[in-house]
């Protein structure tokens, strides 16, 4: 099956650098990403950087290995996640706005073999899920 693409955009009432620093740090993920239980970094104090890798544990038991593949503060950030026959990418773009910034999330999910159908289903839901997660992150940052 071909990759399933998704997209979402959310306005944040903070500067692009603030949104970038929060969203681009895997240690913050369990606070705003609804499907995530925990993040395991090889070194908990490691600052986010290009090539940083970690493992996530999701509510459904999936434990993908994640890696930051783009780190251009404060304008662009990307990651790739792999778990068994599934691969997912996420790219975040940070656009300055008069009242803060807009975060644009684009990505795709693909699966091989027995994982093709579950990946396609996950891809259909990903745009809605990332939109909801980004709105939660915007609320968290807006209240600080």
Language model: regions and residue ranges:
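Amphipathic alpha-helical segments that line or abut small-molecule/effector binding pockets
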Residues: 17-20, 131, 135
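Hydrophobic ligand-binding cavity/cleft-lining segments
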Residues: 1-46
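Residue-level detector of alpha-helix boundaries and kinks
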Residues: 4, 14, 53, 79, ...
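Glycine-rich portal/gate segments that line the openings of hydrophobic small-molecule binding cavities
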Residues: 30, 40-89, 97-98, 102, ...
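Beta-strand elements of well-folded, non-transmembrane domains
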Residues: 14, 60-62, 109-113
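Generic recognition of short, well-ordered alpha-helical interface segments
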Residues: 14, 31, 63, 129-132
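Beta-strand/loop substructures that line and gate deep hydrophobic ligand-binding cavities in soluble
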Residues: 80-132
């Amino acid at each position: 099956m071909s990759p399933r693409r998704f997209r979402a955009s959310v306005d944040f009432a903070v500067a692009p650098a603030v949104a970038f620093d929060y969203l681009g740090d895997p240690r913050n993920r369990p606070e705003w990403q609804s499907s995530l239980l925990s993040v395991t970094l090889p070194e908990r104090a490691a600052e986010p950087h290009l090539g940083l890798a970690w493992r996530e544990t999701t509510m459904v038991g999936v434990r993908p290995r994640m890696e930051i593949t783009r780190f251009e503060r404060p304008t662009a950030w990307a990651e790739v996640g792999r778990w068994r026959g599934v691969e997912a990418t996420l790219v975040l773009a940070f656009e300055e706005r008069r009242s803060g910034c807009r975060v644009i999330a684009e990505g795709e999910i693909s699966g091989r073999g027995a994982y093709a159908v579950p990946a396609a289903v996950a891809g259909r839901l990903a745009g809605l899920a990332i939109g909801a997660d980004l709105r939660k992150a915007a609320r968290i940052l807006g209240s600080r």
